[in-house]
Amino acid sequence: MRALPLNIGTIHFVGIGGIGMSGIAEVLHMLGYKVQGSDIAEGANVQRLRQAGIVVHIGHDAANLGDAQVVVTSTAVKKDNPEVVAARAKLIPVVRRAEMLAELMRLRWSVAIGGTHGKTTTTSLVACVLEHARLDPTVINGGIIEAYGTNTRMGSGDWMVVEADESDGSFLRLPAVIAVVTNMDPEHLDHWGTEEAMQAGYDQFVSNIPFYGFAVLCVDHPQVQQMIPRLSDHRVITYGFSPQADIRAEKVVMDKRGATFEVVVTNRQRNRSRRAGPFRLPMLGHHNVLNSLAAIAVALEMEISDSVIASALTTFKGVKRRFTRTGEYNGISIVDDYGHHPVEIAAVLKAARQAGARNVIAVMQPHRYSRLKVLFNEFCTCMNDADTVIVADVYAAGETPIEGAGRDALVEGLRDRGHRSVVPLPDPAHLAEMINAIAKPGDYVVCLGAGTITQWAQALPAQLEALNRQPATEGAA
């Protein structure tokens, strides 16, 4: 198979610390390519790459290019970035992240997982099952897989599992043999323009698979189900809770540690059905059962046995920032979650209920003014499973403020729609005091967002302990 030549020269990543960029850089490095990069700040991904032997500069400067022969950028990197400007002045190719990922995918048979929500967890689940099947996959994910401690895995097998990013349409470049679509909600309309254009993009993503490949679609989601007749010339496997699904979950039992369920497997070509399982998934929420069904569908089509699938799911350790418990104080559980879309937020809060929370306290840091504006009504109605909602300032992610799409507007919108307990967060420094005043043993504090709120969630258990630590008795030895 023709592939990216090893003598291509130094590959320089602008914004190498990003979750998507770091994974590609790490795999290229492990394959023997000379990789370097830069980022605006230190971080866990930067530290990990340095430990792997990759040179990372902090700050963007034309001098960082050195002897680079290729420059890789993401959509977060502006055209006037000094390193990009210098590369173009030197006639060095500037490559988009997805294009470099596509080159890596040409080295293997690839599974690409797309969708508005659940991509990272589903990618991790597929990788886990393939690993248990001894297929030794290479993995490039959009989140940290707890079992690996990183978002990548370098395997020697024939398969690669990747998370497909739809935010800028770049997933249309990916040469997948198996394409998964978990769901399709309005998101990233700043790129797509309209929902119709976004749907057409997903159609193309799946249509790109070769005739010997197949698509795995969540039939529970109406927009995804509507794709099926448009893909009549492709092999399509559906999954979900729907009686119409080829891979259908039944007898789902939720407890405080996860879910147990059986699966009805229907082969429409042979008009046969059989029952598989039970399967045990140590993750909360019906949305994660759906994610596991996608992995089961992929695995069964690859002729992986039920027992191997069951073993993989049972041992699955999850993904960082997906209902991750950062600690506990006085019976109060602190949870960190990446959820920043209304559908994700509603699913996470429901999972907290299923975990047995006495009360659920949601701490929300909205991510991007544009998202809050476009989905304002949805944000105002997705918090019903939270007894109390604490709303922080919007994490701008480089955007300028938009009137009517800020913290106070969201607080008012939630109250107007009937939520009985919504309060603004004056400043992150006040969070521990606010939680200390309202949380009781058995409560769950769920921190939601894609910005800096993860740092608050990590610090909160120790901050609560410090607030309640009794001062030393005067005169004590």
Swiss-Prot record:
Cellular location(s): Cytoplasm
Metabolic or biological pathway, per its Swiss-Prot or TrEMBL entry: Cell wall biogenesis; peptidoglycan biosynthesis
Documented EC number(s): 6.3.2.8
Family annotation (InterPro entries): Mur-like_cat_sf, Mur_ligase_C, Mur_ligase_C_dom_sf, Mur_ligase_cen, Mur_ligase_N, MurCDEF_pg_biosynth, UDP-N-AcMur_Ala_ligase_MurC
Catalytic reaction equation(s): UDP-N-acetyl-alpha-D-muramate + L-alanine + ATP = UDP-N-acetyl-alpha-D-muramoyl-L-alanine + ADP + phosphate + H(+)
GO MF annotations in UniProt: ATP binding; UDP-N-acetylmuramate-L-alanine ligase activity
UniProt-listed Pfam families: Mur_ligase, Mur_ligase_C, Mur_ligase_M
UniProt record, GO biological process: cell division; cell wall organization; peptidoglycan biosynthetic process; regulation of cell shape
GO terms under cellular component: cytoplasm
Cell wall biogenesis/degradation listed as a keyword: yes
Main location: cytoplasm
Enzyme class: ligase
Residues involved in ATP binding: G115, T116, H117, G118, K119, T120, T121
Function: Cell wall formation.
Similarity comment: Belongs to the MurCDEF family.
Annotated NCBIfam families: murC
Full protein name: UDP-N-acetylmuramate--L-alanine ligase
Source organism phylogeny: Bacteria, Pseudomonadati, Pseudomonadota, Alphaproteobacteria, Acetobacterales
